[in-house]
Amino acid sequence: MTHYRRFYELIIVLLLAILTTLVFWLTDWDYRLASIFYHPEKIGDVWPLQHHWFLKILFDYAFPFIVAVGVSALSIFLLSHVHDHSRPYRRQALYVLLVIALGPGLVVNLIFKDHWGRPRPVHIQEFGGEYQYIPPVKIGHTLDKSFVCGHCSVGYAFFAVYFLAKNHKLIYLALTLGLAWTMGFTRMTAGGHFVSDILWSGYLVFLVAYALYYGWYARIKPSSLE
């Protein structure tokens, strides 16, 4: 069963990445979805929803939250070397820590976001900015950091729980997507990201969590970390 699930998980994510990217290359849906939150008639505040108090809380505390989760995982991993009651959770804690560090930390923010140069919606010409729209995956030549969504990766980091869970996987998957897409919504209201940025953030973090789980976690024996 695990072998088949491993195969289908990878195929489904790769197909979704290809199909959604093609849709955004061949249509103007990326632009149209972003335009829902753009109100040019409101002079001086063309992205008004971004000021909602709840959305501001989500924006301000997303990264402190995931840092706290990472620090907690690191603490459990370190404590497992001195306290027996933490030892059964050593591998799980290290796996969660690695997913956070390599997914949102390295791949999303340091590799893609910092170097892809895709303009944010707020900075493209259609929304009063200076840059031309660039479709997802295509590298831009601006200082903008639209591709991919960093705040969304905070939610997607909980793909780690999906992989670790032995039961109710679909529930954990739904909760992870719900959290990530809520974060994506907060960024779209400010003109910070396109839908394609949000989806690609998920594809990347999922692939990191997938590779760590099947390439390392599922292969090692608990005794190897003693």
What label would you give each PLM region?
Residues 11-18, 66, 70, 98-107, ...:
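Hydrophobic, lipid-facing residues on alpha-helical transmembrane segments of integral membrane proteins
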Residues 2-13, 133-226:
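Membrane-embedded catalytic cores of phosphoryl/pyrophosphoryl-handling enzymes
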Residues 19-24, 101-107, 178-188:
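Aromatic-anchored segments of alpha-helical transmembrane domains
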